[in-house]
Swiss-Prot record:
Residues 19-134 form a propeptide. SMART domains: Inhibitor_I29, Pept_C1. Residues 1-18 form the signal peptide. InterPro entries: Papain-like_cys_pep_sf, Pept_asp_AS, Pept_cys_AS, Pept_his_AS, Peptidase_C1A, Peptidase_C1A_C, Peptidase_C1A_papain-like, Prot_inhib_I29. It catalyses: Specificity similar to that of papain. Its EC number is 3.4.22.6. This is Chymopapain. The keyword NADP does not apply. GO terms for biological process: proteolysis. Glycans are attached at residue 86. Keywords: Disulfide bond, Glycoprotein, Hydrolase, Protease, Signal, Thiol protease, Zymogen. PROSITE patterns: THIOL_PROTEASE_ASN, THIOL_PROTEASE_CYS, THIOL_PROTEASE_HIS.
Length: 352
């Protein structure tokens, strides 16, 4: 097996390292590197090895490790250049730092859709919170005990299931007082209108829970693959909802009015490199509004004069702020930062 010194020589001969000696004020523990790490190929290799250990990365061959190192190095340079721009957020060496942006998009974002033609059309008159105009300046459903720990969808395009389940977990806690971790795998296997690990619908997954209920994740654990539906074989009670409704599109007031009352299933454009490598702070792009990823809005607030929405992601706790992102609101775009106001749904349980 090749030694680290031989890897260093191979990479050094194959590539020309461009040294960036910026004066980034980012803390090492925030972004995962220091400026000293950029001064030599040896320091970069040491950084890569420590990053691999932290994120449990194992590669099948020395060629694969060299290839991943080169992507890691390129991403690090992009991170460092971005962090010098005095943005309201930091990028960092998260678990996606060895993936090209194309690889990242293929594995972790993709097909999600807000509507399924076989279901009822919802108009603004059906919106529960249309008369809510006086809502608190901030709310965090995590602090209210209505949010389960951050989960990880893995290399399965099941974000739609995680987003739906998080909203059902939230409304179940709000109505019954019980916070239960529910089964995303049941939706992946059993929502026949969605496509398992290849994407899915907010609407049909919510309708599935309304029609059938959903088991806890302990009874029906997540496996990051689609299998035959086994819901009828599982014991124990299910959590059900009465139905679901849509938040009027492209309206921040309606969005915040609903979010003040419960977590929301939302879609965003998450395929850009800044979103991939986000570490902390209030994210304001660049990103577009071509929706490709489902997340859960679990609160909103203000920090240092910057207003934001708290979104819970399904990429594990090593992405972002322990699995969360603060997404800028009042962006000047009616669709919201990354299109967050375009497609939002919420379940209801025992009230309309």
């Amino acid at each position: 097996m090749a030694t680290m010194s031989s890897i260093s020589k191979i990479i050094f001969l194959a590539t020309c390292l461009i040294i960036h000696m910026g004066l980034s004020s980012a803390d090492f523990y925030t972004v995962g590197y220091s400026q000293d790490d950029l001064t030599s190929i040896e320091r970069l290799i040491q950084l890569f090895d420590s990053w691999m250990l932290k994120h449990n990365k194992i590669y099948e061959s020395i060629d694969e490790k060299i290839y991943r190192f080169e992507i890691f190095r390129d991403n690090l340079m992009y991170i460092d250049e971005t962090n010098k721009k005095n943005n309201s957020y930091w990028l960092g060496l998260n678990g996606f730092a060895d993936l090209s942006n194309d690889e990242f998009k293929k594995k972790y974002v993709g097909f999600v859709a807000e509507d399924f033609t076989g279901l009822e059309h919802f108009d603004n008159e059906d919106f529960t919170y249309k008369h809510v105009t006086n809502y608190p300046q901030s709310i965090d459903w995590r602090a209210k005990g209505a949010v389960t720990p951050v989960k990880n969808q893995g290399a399965c395009g099941s974000c739609w299931a995680f987003s739906t389940i998080a909203t059902v977990e939230g409304i179940n806690k709000i109505v019954t007082g019980n916070l239960l971790e529910l089964s995303e795998q049941e939706l992946v296997d059993c929502d026949k209108h969605s496509y398992g690990c290849k994407g899915g619908y907010q609407t049909t997954s919510l309708q599935y829970v309304a029609n059938n209920g959903v088991h806890t994740s302990k009874v029906y654990p997540y496996q990051a693959k689609q299998y035959k539906c086994r819901a009828t074989d599982k014991p124990g009670p299910k959590v059900k909802i009465t139905g679901y409704k849509r938040v009027p599109s492209n309206c921040e007031t309606s969005f915040l009015g609903a979010l003040a009352n419960q977590p929301l299933s939302v879609l965003v454009e998450a395929g850009g490199k800044p979103f991939q490598l986000y570490k902390s702070g209030v994210f304001d792009g660049p990103c577009g509004t071509k929706l490709d990823h489902a997340v859960t809005a679990v609160g909103y607030g203000t920090s240092d004069g910057k207003n934001y929405i708290i979104i819970k992601n399904s990429w594990g706790p090593n992405w972002g702020e322990k699995g969360y992102m603060r997404l800028k609101r009042q962006s000047g775009n009616s669709q919201g930062t990354c299109g967050v106001y375009k497609s939002s749904y919420y379940p209801f349980k025992g009230f309309a």
